[in-house]
Amino acid sequence: MSEDTRTWAHMLERAKTNNFLGKQLFVVFTYPADGMEPIMENITEHLAYQRMLEDTGVMFAAGPMGDRGGETWSGSGMVVVRAENFAAAEKIAAADPMHASGARNYHVQPWLVNEGTITVKVGFASGSRELD
């Protein structure tokens, strides 16, 4: 192993020994295979699948990714999922109607959440919600 790389197992262990959060998630980067038309044709089924992942606690977060500079959207997105392992995350990604139909291509990468903060504000009566 070169000095510039570490095994993923090493990174997981290092998170534990350094008292980091060490939460392993999987990021699905998804991007158009052939323009926007196939994406729009599959958007309803895709969103239903996303809702199912959310309802079952598989989805951590998801949403579209703006193009560089944030001026436009060309159909790219990111989905962060909870999965037992890489193979399970791949299976979740492959089942997305966007990917199964060929409207989008994707790749999955493991992500180790070590640092950061999150603030959640929920208004019970108003039904408002805020994430910061």
Segments (PLM) and residue ranges:
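Conserved, structured core segments of small domains
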Residues: 1-132
